[in-house]
């Protein structure tokens, strides 16, 4: 998804969610500055080299654990969306890529970063967490405003749908969604403070609505075939 295609979605999201475009821009610039100073960033062509034709994107929905118990996932690149990283590690699976706005369990993100490329997303609400990226060996920066030179915007809003847009941008031919659920139940892996699956709160419902709409857009407009993992 190009910026011109993403912009109308973004403007709707900002209006409905009450976000600040200026704060989002500040966050993108801050992430860029940190990555440039620390020199631990990669460019998209480097990430492209590790993405296989088949990509599994792991969301943190309530059906994730059952999928991890029965799936193999060795025939494709494994991209974990933030909180799903903790579930994968618990089941002995190391993701190849983690897409995160640093909202998951930090210790698990740090563990995963030893082997995974960390795709870190900057927005107005996580500027205080962005200095953490200096702890990650390899980082690809993303944002939700206009892209900068080393901070990209491939489209997508939540960690899960952004991961799918990332896979599309990297040339995947097939994207398998694992642990995605739009029924209104939030999986316990979604937030570090959750102890069990729980009904979605108002802002989360809005995010799920946008995520579903964006994935439908990707199915209809992207090159990759997008399917849901079946147990």
Curated annotation (Swiss-Prot):
SUPFAM superfamilies: Thiamin pyrophosphokinase, catalytic domain (SSF63999). It is an enzyme of class 2 (transferase). Its EC number is 2.7.6.3. GO terms for biological process: thiamine diphosphate biosynthetic process. Keywords: ATP-binding, Kinase, Magnesium, Nucleotide-binding, Transferase. GO terms for molecular function: 2-amino-4-hydroxy-6-hydroxymethyldihydropteridine diphosphokinase activity; ATP binding; kinase activity; magnesium ion binding; thiamine diphosphokinase activity. Its cofactor is Mg(2+). It comes from the Archaea. It catalyses: 6-hydroxymethyl-7,8-dihydropterin + ATP = (7,8-dihydropterin-6-yl)methyl diphosphate + AMP + H(+). Catalyzes the transfer of diphosphate from ATP to 6-hydroxymethyl-7,8-dihydropterin (6-HMD), leading to 6-hydroxymethyl-7,8-dihydropterin diphosphate (6-HMDP). To a lesser extent, can also use CTP, UTP, and GTP as the nucleotide triphosphate substrate. Belongs to the archaeal 6-HMPDK family. This is 6-hydroxymethyl-7,8-dihydropterin pyrophosphokinase. The lineage of its organism: Archaea, Methanobacteriati, Methanobacteriota, Thermococci, Thermococcales.
């Amino acid at each position: 998804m190009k910026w011109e295609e993403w912009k109308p979605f973004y403007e709707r999201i900002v209006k409905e969610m009450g976000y600040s475009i200026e704060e989002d821009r500040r966050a993108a610039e801050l992430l860029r500055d940190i990555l440039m100073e620390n020199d631990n960033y990669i460019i998209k062509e480097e990430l492209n080299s590790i993405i296989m034709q088949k990509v599994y994107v792991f969301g943190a929905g309530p059906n994730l654990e059952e999928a991890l118990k029965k799936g193999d996932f060795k025939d494709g690149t494994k991209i974990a969306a933030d909180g799903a990283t903790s579930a994968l590690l618990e089941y002995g699976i190391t993701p190849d890529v983690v897409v995160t706005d640093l909202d998951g369990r930090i210790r698990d993100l740090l563990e995963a970063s030893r082997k995974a490329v960390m795709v870190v997303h900057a927005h107005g609400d996580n500027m205080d967490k962005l200095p953490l990226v200096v702890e990650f060996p390899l980082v690809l920066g993303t944002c939700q405003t206009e892209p900068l030179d080393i901070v990209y915007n491939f489209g997508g809003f939540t960690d899960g749908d952004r991961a799918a847009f990332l896979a599309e941008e990297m040339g995947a031919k097939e994207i398998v969604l694992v642990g995605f659920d739009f029924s209104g139940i939030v999986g316990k892996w979604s937030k570090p403070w959750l102890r069990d699956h729980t009904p979605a709160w108002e802002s989360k419902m809005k995010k799920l609505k946008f995520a579903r709409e964006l994935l439908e857009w990707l199915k209809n407009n992207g090159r990759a075939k997008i399917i849901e993992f079946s147990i």
